[in-house]
Amino acid sequence: MKQIAWDEVMKRLEVASKICNDASPVQVEGPIHVGVDLGTADVVVMAVDDNGMPVSAFLEWATVVRDGVVVDYHGAITIVKRLVSMTEERLGRKITEASTSYPPGTDARLSTNILDAANLRLVSTADEPSCLARLARLDRAAVVDIGGGTTGTAVISNGKVIASVDDAES
């Protein structure tokens, strides 16, 4: 996978910020890829096109997760279903699958079970800092993900995550 320039990563983040919670319908040609982030402070459902450019992003502030653990299972499912429905409305297509992430050192099933309960087929899962490393196609770097309740760190060498830890493990 070819590394992308940092300005391209920033452009993608700026687009995501600009379209966040924008329900205006858009036409997207080709496949889309959906990700679900169950955070301590919020829940996000984002869709990107086949080039990795955000085409839909919905965020809802929530307290369904605490320190990387889902503490309100029903609430998390309800929010994910609502945000997926909003994504479907914006894109004019049914969402049946998604990827998700989790804080390093926690059980991935805490996130994947929510997707399953929301009737989404799991495409992939990885710890949160590793997801950013993949998105940015980093070759050699350290990624720090400072969240609302956890801080994850990943070290990347030759494009592979060689270490990934959470502040709770340190």
What are the residue ranges of the model-derived segments?
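Conserved structured catalytic cores and adjacent interaction surfaces
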Residues: 154
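Nucleotide/phosphate-binding catalytic cleft detector across ATP-hydrolyzing
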Residues: 1-40, 44-146, 158-169
